[in-house]
C-alpha cells in the first residue's frame, strides 16, 4: 500500500483522507518538511492559494516540497492546489509563490465568488464510465497550457471551454473538488500514478 500525503495546512483535509483511503492508499497528514520523507506522493488540497503559499513559507516546507516535486514525486492539486502547481498565476499577489510543476497559466477565482459556486457533470479524458460530478467553489481555470500538458476536461464539456483538469508527467490538477461526494475516480487515478512510481 502506498503512502500518500495530504498537505494539511488548510482545506478539505478530512475529505481527501477519506477519498484516498477509499482508493486503496494510506493517507498521511503532512505539516512539516521532515514528514515528506514518509510519503510516496502528495495531495495539495483547496483553500486560499495566497494563504497557502504564505503558510508553506512560514512552516519552512516550501523549498523541501519544491525539491521533491522537481525530483518527480507525484503530486495532485485541487482548486488552490492547482494554482500552487502552475508556472504562471493571474490575479495572484506579487509575493505569491508556486511550484511550477505544470506548464500552465492559471487564473485565480476565475469562476467568480462563493455565490457563483456550482456543480456540473464532466467528461474526463482517461476516466471511464459516467460523467464525473465536479464541484466548483471559487475555482480557478487554466487559460493556457504548454505542449507537455494533457488537457483532461473543460467546463461545459465544450471544445473551447475553460480548462479545468490537466496532467503533466507525475503532476495532476483539477480546478474542482473531487474529494466532495463519493466518486473516488480522480483519487483512484492519482493512487495508480503513485503506485507506478513507488
Q: Where on the chain are the PLM-derived regions?
A:
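N-terminal beta1-alpha1 cap of cysteine-dependent amidohydrolase-like domains
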Residues: 1-58, 62-70, 184-198
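Hydrophobic anchor at the start of a short beta-strand
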Residues: 27-28, 75, 171
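Short coil/turn connectors at secondary-structure junctions
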Residues: 1, 39, 71-73, 96-97, ...
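Short secondary-structure boundary/hinge segments and terminal tails
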Residues: 37-39, 86, 126
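Amide-donor transfer/coupling interface in amidating biosynthetic enzymes
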Residues: 108-198
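Redox-cofactor binding/interface segments in oxidoreductases and associated redox assembly factors
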Residues: 44, 77, 174
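Cysteine-nucleophile active-site neighborhood
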Residues: 49-123
Amino acid at each position: 500500500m502506498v503512502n500518500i500525503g495530504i498537505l494539511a495546512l488548510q482545506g478539505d483535509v478530512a475529505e481527501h483522507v477519506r477519498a484516498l483511503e477509499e482508493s486503496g492508499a494510506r493517507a498521511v497528514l503532512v505539516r512539516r518538511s521532515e514528514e515528506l520523507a514518509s510519503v510516496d506522493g502528495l495531495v495539495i488540497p483547496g483553500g486560499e492559494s495566497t494563504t497557502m503559499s504564505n503558510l508553506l513559507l512560514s512552516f519552512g516546507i516550501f523549498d523541501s516540497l519544491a525539491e521533491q516535486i522537481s525530483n518527480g514525486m507525484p503530486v495532485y492539486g485541487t482548486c488552490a492546489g492547482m494554482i500552487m502547481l502552475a508556472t504562471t498565476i493571474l490575479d495572484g499577489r506579487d509575493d505569491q509563490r508556486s511550484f511550477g510543476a505544470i506548464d500552465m497559466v492559471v487564473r485565480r477565482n476565475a469562476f467568480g465568488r462563493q455565490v457563483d459556486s456550482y456543480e456540473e457533470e464532466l467528461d474526463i479524458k482517461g476516466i471511464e464510465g459516467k460523467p464525473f460530478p465536479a464541484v466548483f467553489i471559487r475555482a480557478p481555470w487554466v487559460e493556457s497550457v504548454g505542449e507537455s500538458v494533457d488537457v483532461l476536461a473543460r467546463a461545459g464539456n465544450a471544445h473551447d471551454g475553460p480548462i479545468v483538469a490537466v496532467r503533466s508527467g507525475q503532476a495532476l490538477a483539477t480546478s474542482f473538488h473531487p474529494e466532495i461526494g463519493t466518486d473516488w475516480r480522480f483519487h483512484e487515478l492519482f493512487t495508480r500514478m503513485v503506485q507506478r512510481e513507488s
